[in-house]
């Protein structure tokens, strides 16, 4: 199964009185070039100044082959399409860690109150101007809670996509994790990772 746009409870949500438009306090960084990793990080921190392209490029150049978690997925120098190694190192500069989620586990055991946000890597359609090409490429997106609700802050979206509460979020995550080539990172404070308190079953 390939990853396709989330539809889940969208129809139900659209017919309800729950808000669909993004409240003004949500920071949603839009896609520029191949900088989806940068956008996902800034959207997680809800801060346009959390990271810059230059910051991520410095981190990438600092990482040696011996420290690469997945050396076969290295970013091409300077193109901005950074891999998980750069994301993990960038988070560590802010006192956070990325927990790579084992897709065999039930997302129901995630202690959501201890997770700041989620970064997902999933296939996304390529576009040439207004044209959508019949090709897919891996893409980083951010999902996080703002104002008591969870939102998909994919930088390719025109505006944040409302997901809903905790149960809707878990459905969203399950749906995408069933797909091929979809991965999930939990963004948590260092102390949460150290004590594994992102798990509700410990």
Curated annotation (Swiss-Prot):
Any one of the GO CC terms: plasma membrane
Localization: Cell membrane; Cytoplasm
Post-translational modification (record): Monoubiquitinated. Ubiquitination activates deubiquitination activity in vitro.
Annotated active site: 36, 139
UniProt keyword annotation of Cell inner membrane present: no
Organism domain of life: Eukaryota
Main location, first listed in the record: membrane
Tissue: Widely expressed (at protein level).
A Gene Ontology BP annotation from the UniProt entry: cell motility
Cross-referenced Gene3D superfamilies: 3.90.70.40
Sequence ranges assigned to domain Josephin in this UniProt record: 23-202
Keyword field contains Cell membrane: yes
Residue ranges of the region described as Disordered: 1-22
Annotated keywords: Cell membrane, Cytoplasm, Hydrolase, Membrane, Phosphoprotein, Protease, Ubl conjugation, Ubl conjugation pathway
Subunit structure: Interacts with beta-actin/ACTB.
PANTHER family for this protein: JOSEPHIN 1, 2, JOSEPHIN-1
Protein name: Josephin-1
Originating organism: Mus musculus
């Amino acid at each position: 199964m390939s990853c396709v746009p989330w539809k889940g409870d969208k129809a139900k949500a659209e017919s309800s009185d729950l808000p669909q438009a993004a409240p003004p306090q949500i920071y949603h960084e839009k896609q520029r070039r191949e900088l989806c990793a940068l956008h996902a990080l800034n959207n997680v921190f809800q801060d346009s100044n959390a990271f810059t392209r230059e910051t991520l490029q410095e981190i990438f150049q600092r990482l040696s082959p011996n420290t690469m978690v997945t050396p076969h997925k290295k970013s091409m120098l300077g193109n901005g399409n950074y891999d998980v190694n750069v994301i993990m190192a960038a988070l560590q500069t802010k006192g956070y860690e990325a927990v790579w989620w084992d897709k065999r586990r039930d997302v129901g055991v995630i202690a959501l109150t201890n997770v700041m946000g989620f970064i997902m890597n999933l296939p996304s359609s390529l576009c040439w101007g207004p044209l959508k090409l019949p090709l897919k490429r891996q893409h980083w997106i951010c999902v996080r809670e703002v104002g008591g609700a969870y939102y998909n802050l994919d930088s390719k979206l025109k505006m944040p996509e409302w997901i809903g509460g905790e149960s809707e979020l878990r459905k969203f995550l399950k749906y995408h994790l069933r797909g091929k080539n979809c991965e999930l990172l939990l963004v948590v404070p260092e102390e949460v990772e150290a004590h594994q308190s992102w798990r509700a079953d410990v």
